[in-house]
Amino acid sequence: MKKHIKTLKKKLKIFDSKLKEECGVFGISNTKDASALTALGLHALQHRGQEGCGIVTFNGKQYFSEKRFGLVGDNFNKEKVLKKLQGDYAIGHNRYSTTGENTLRNIQPFFADLHIGGLSIAHIGNLTNALLLREILVKDGAIFRTTSDTETIVQLVAKSKREKFLDKLIDALFQIQGGYSLVLMTNKKLVGVRDPLGIRPLVIGKLKNSYIFASETCALDIVGAKFIREVENGEVIIIENEIITSIKPFPKQKPRPCVFEYIYFARPDSLINNKCAYEYRKCLGAKLAEETDIDADLIVPVPDSGVPAALGYAEQSNKKFELGLIRNHYVGRTFIEPTQSIRSLGVKLKLSSTRTIVKNKKVILIDDSLVRGTTCHKIVKMLYESGAKEVHVRIACPEIKYPDFYGVDMPTKEELLAHEKSNKEMCEYIKAKSLKFLSLGGLYNALIKEKRNLNYPQFSDHYFTGEYPIKPHDNLNGLKIKQLSLLSAKSNN
């Protein structure tokens, strides 16, 4: 049965043209409920990765690990499982594979028994020079057990000639490049790290006498923790004996956080710069209405991620907001064999239209982004089949023309609809009456009320501009995974 479910999920991916999240991390210190609280934190971060989850704990003498495929609630919902994870310190990880094969050995957190003591690590993001470093390490005798770029960090720490753990870690950090956030646990420390540009997110909070690192503030909320602040770009925070130490080993740089945390990735109730992601998305929708409004009867969001932008659009344009599409949240857990007839249903397994709402209406369909366009094409068709008079598509971000190399699972450049097609060609492909995107200037105005700095953009906005904040050394796609697999096999022979 599990094989059937896994096969169905794999088949359904061809109907899901959204960008994919880049994993979630959680770490907590000094609490007897470390494993249970970590499971709760990971549950709140489930949207960031659904392929696998893991927790590692430390009880002062020994490390305990549990890693499984699937959702947190399906794997860490039994008391007997959590009781096995003994200790007052814990770190956890939700996986969505952006590099490395989808195998149990690639599920984090990773653990290594180094000569200086145990080390466990959970990582979100991608290292753009991971393949290069891996080749060097393998030639130097390193043996890799996984195809994940996270293990590269562990190997660099192990190889460092520095004596103390923190010095070894910093030595490793100076060798890696990319967008990343790390939570690490040793015999005596809980450590949080954010990349020099702050591309990937990390926050710190407090719960009684415990400190917590998490990818988003929603993970702090679920355990009742107080949000302290975001970990700054290039910052390393060490928690030892419940004393916080902050160091910034990298040369100072202005932050360039991933703009898609604002647009799509972060849960709507999570704080970014002390403002809910939901509010940013409403502002994007309002600005979209300012730039692209047209005569219509209804504003209809693509659920769930298109809802905030659609609300902002409706308020700004003074048009009626309706749930013209209903999402089935349980499709990923359907216990059926995916026959061709089932697969042909496509997007209807996930969405259905409220036909009496859209019938004979001019509809403005709002979504947060347009990637391949396959899902949008099917939704537009569905609305017309339900009797819509016109369907106008409005996208609350600029055209996505370039791939990501910092931890987001997304199509190659050639698969991106906007990479080579004109607006007219894209509109013809999705079969809409019209298609408009939020401008790049409108995006910046909506998010920070500023113009884009042409010399040093305030965000990592390479999806739209092709201006990468860090040179992508490695080819982070299927080719890289194959190369990593070959290197892994070579290092294990």
Where are these predicted regions, by residue range?
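Secondary-structure transition/capping motifs at alpha-helix termini
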Residues: 142, 162-163, 293-297, 315-322, ...
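PRPP-dependent phosphoribosyltransferase catalytic core
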Residues: 173, 188-189, 224-230, 381-493
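A conserved beta-strand->alpha-helix junction
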Residues: 76, 146, 151, 321-332, ...
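Amphipathic alpha-helical
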Residues: 152-164, 303, 315-333
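Short, glycine/charge-rich flexible loops or terminal/linker lids adjacent to PRPP-binding catalytic cores
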Residues: 318-363, 374, 401-408
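Extended, hydrophobic alpha-helical segments in both membrane/secreted and soluble proteins
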Residues: 299, 306-313, 317, 321, ...
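Conserved short alpha-helical segments that host acidic/polar catalytic motifs at enzyme active sites
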Residues: 1-233, 238-296, 302, 390
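Flexible loop/turn segments at secondary-structure boundaries
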Residues: 33-35, 98-99, 129, 199-200, ...
